[in-house]
Amino acid sequence: MESLKSPVFLLILHLLEGVLSESLIQLNNNGYEGIVIAIDHDVPEDEALIQHIKDMVTQASPYLFEATGKRFYFKNVAILIPESWKAKPEYTRPKLETFKNADVLVSTTSPLGNDEPYTEHIGACGEKGIRIHLTPDFLAGKKLTQYGPQDRTFVHEWAHFRWGVFNEYNNDEKFYLSKGKPQAVRCSAAITGKNQVRRCQGGSCITNGKCVIDRVTGLYKDNCVFVPDPHQNEKASIMFNQNINSVVEFCTEKNHNQEAPNDQNQRCNLRSTWEVIQESEDFKQTTPMTAQPPAPTFSLLQIGQRIVCLVLDKSGSMLNDDRLNRMNQASRLFLLQTVEQGSWVGMVTFDSAAYVQSELKQLNSGADRDLLIKHLPTVSAGGTSICSGLRTAFTVIKKKYPTDGSEIVLLTDGEDNTISSCFDLVKQSGAIIHTVALGPAAAKELEQLSKMTGGLQTYSSDQVQNNGLVDAFAALSSGNAAIAQHSIQLESRGVNLQNNQWMNGSVIVDSSVGKDTLFLITWTTHPPTIFIWDPSGVEQNGFILDTTTKVAYLQVPGTAKVGFWKYSIQASSQTLTLTVTSRAASATLPPITVTPVVNKNTGKFPSPVTVYASIRQGASPILRASVTALIESVNGKTVTLELLDNGAGADATKNDGVYSRFFTAFDANGRYSVKIWALGGVTSDRQRAAPPKNRAMYIDGWIEDGEVRMNPPRPETSYVQDKQLCFSRTSSGGSFVATNVPAAAPIPDLFPPCQITDLKASIQGQNLVNLTWTAPGDDYDHGRASNYIIRMSTSIVDLRDHFNTSLQVNTTGLIPKEASSEEIFEFELGGNTFGNGTDIFIAIQAVDKSNLKSEISNIARVSVFIPAQEPPIPEDSTPPCPDISINSTIPGIHVLKIMWKWLGEMQVTLGLH
């Protein structure tokens, strides 16, 4: 049975939780409502695909229900259908559902370049993911032998997405040493199976007998895989291998394998997946059901033309700080460039009342855009009635279309204590409201409108040189348009000039963009002198000046030349800003994009806000970019953060194209804006991107009628960056609100060093331990810690639970380096304390100058393994064997490096990744 409308207007308050995910999902009486599964623009029309999606969710719901102790099930799902597909009577217009906030994206290829199911997740353990990626072939059941049934795999990915748990297998190293014996990485450890040698040639693999232990390393030799037995008694764990028939549960505290070197142990402090799920808000607000849940219902929604109404404040306070004119400058950019061709746009202004400046007009030409620009307000007076503006905008939209799925861009600088009176109307409208708070006095309730409708919330101060207002409007591309239609910001900068000074610089137009390129310049008093040259040195003419609005713009015809576009702008005693935007040069070549994310839209001091920027070209991550966040407070103070992709501090995974940093420099309560700058340069070497962490398990093989059968080799995406990258991007990251910041200066130091997450250990000889890690800071990942506490134990659980009483290592002479630096430290184990086969676990805690301590680091592990002696070789035998060097990397727990010389000299090195 299908419901014709998606009840998205009910899915409101959950959006207050945070913004790592823009999901509309709400948990209502144990059922997940508002799930959005979007079929990407590149997927050819295929009605069977819709049925495949329905079948997967319908079959997954009871599996999820039983796996979670009768707590959760899938209640209703909206399937978002591309505009290019043929319209049908059962397809209705979306409300708040967009491709941008989709929970599941169905695309012809996954971000891995193949059919592997995968979940985007950039946050910490327990934080929600961004979205799940599936392919049509996977949904059609064409990958059953590689990934297992679609419904079970979907529940596996749902756990990544909704509860922030991680895989309990290891795709890179499938075995580890425990008490001197090799064990398959699995959870629970009660899962039984065969250790088989897999031989692959071309596109097929066969089994080649039982695995053999390497007498030097203690691990199995290369090409050994663990193949689970078909009949098991163990019910866990879904995050290990949900394809095993008996597996219907998550690992719990009782059966969790804490020693296994997997991401769940590494990222979640050895906790089981069920322990993490139990700490989620979902779990806390539910109790087990006593009856079976109903089957999911589905709504089929088809994307249509974009419908936008500008709702602009022209009250008396807009005279302050030239706000009315600045609003018109930013609105001009939106109308000229940001809003996509073919969109319908209207305009309403408001003070104490509201006024229709333009009914909905379709933008099919430059003349259509210019006509709307002429309706921008020129006079400001009166009070502020935000609800009047919204009601009038709904009326304007309803004259042409239903308000479902329409958008409102609401800008205001004033207080309005009646704004909550139209909240119900907004919820019922099905419209998405983007809010722009201008200046320090904008209504504090303003963000509620964007939060309850899934819109973008932005903030601009009156510091004109930061160009925040233009950035806010530049960020308002459609959440449903294909990326090739999006306006992409290449540059945004401003400067205060004196005495005929110049603003000089260059903008990079890379090969992925160049269409509809626009240079927009604003000033505050008199028109400046403007020079722009293309990469060939040809001066550009054709600037259009509007001295009333104090803006000039140049639209580059055709596709802009690739290279450096230079500019020189001269002025005196005023502020200039420059904004450059463009679009994809080709519909077939994805443009390089920057997607900013903050982990919360309300930050309560002293909890830090985490700023992320994902830089990609299509599905491929962009590495080694220079990425900076500019964060501006309500006081006008700006803080510049270098975002890093180093796998330390706020950054979860090294070299995945996601750049991260903690923000702790709060100076006041109120709004903070976020802006990202990204610059790519020449790469001097081939840099390999890290594979995504939350991939579905590829099944190496299975047992059928007592025989082991092997799958073809796992499809691998190299993600090798082997070309020069030269690009520039700017993007607004929206805004967040800080609360609980102390009013009195100086603000107390309440921020400890961040957790060390990349501790690695190795042992040389029989007693020299080498440690490496990335230095934390005094305040999370900023500054310099004061000292380190290093402790060790032969019990991984004791070290975690009783760190303060574990054996402490002498760290005399260890002086912490600046945050993000590499730390190296060596210490000796005492005498013959640890015998052969002993596992030694090591962890670090950082301490700052206020004696605030970080969380305990990830736990590094070394194992003392002494190979059996070979019988002596007679003197008349062949010459001694040459040196042997063996390296085996085990991400998540240990790096094993063994060097053995025939003369009896031995080095055993084990360390943690």
UniProtKB/Swiss-Prot annotation:
Marked site: Cleavage: 695-696
Source domain of life: Eukaryota
GO molecular function per UniProt: chloride channel activity; intracellularly calcium-gated chloride channel activity; metal ion binding; metallopeptidase activity
Secreted keyword on record: yes
Class of the enzyme per the UniProt entry, highest EC level: hydrolase
Disruption phenotype: Mice exhibit significantly increased bronchoalveolar lavage (BAL) inflammation consisted predominantly of neutrophils; have decreased goblet cell hyperplasia as well as decreased mucus production; have decreased airway hypersensitivity after cholinergic provocation with methacholine.
Keywords: Autocatalytic cleavage, Calcium, Calcium transport, Chloride, Glycoprotein, Hydrolase, Ion transport, Metal-binding, Metalloprotease, Protease, Secreted, Signal, Transport, Zinc
PANTHER family noted in UniProt: CALCIUM-ACTIVATED CHLORIDE CHANNEL REGULATOR, CALCIUM-ACTIVATED CHLORIDE CHANNEL REGULATOR 1
Protein name: Calcium-activated chloride channel regulator 1
Gene responsible for this protein: Clca1
